[in-house]
Amino acid sequence: MSERKRIYLCLAHMSEDGMEQKYVKEAFDTNWVVPLGPNVNGFEKDLEEFVGQNKRVVALSAGTAAVHLALLNCGVGPGDEVLVQSFTFCASSHPITYLGATPVFID
């Protein structure tokens, strides 16, 4: 019987130049181990330049924060209804209720 080839689902690895350890150490040394700070600011700036076309970039700490920001940007507010899949985690509907809107669960 031949041995099966292992398929890695996570491609996390150190880059060729190994700068990851430098950035992690820098974050701890400067006490910026939070979802903001100079490294995040630099990432946002670099990504804006990469995307171009006068697009703005915001790095967020969680998917829930991203949904919340997207709903704000769409103008969702009190009295609105927002469709949400019913087979989901509560974090999908919480940003809707934060804004005073009503989640409507659908399949």
Can you name each region flagged by the protein language model?
Residues M1-N73, G77, L99:
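Conserved PLP-binding active-site segment in aminotransferase class I/II-type PLP enzymes
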Residues L72, V76-D107:
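PLP-dependent aminotransferase-like
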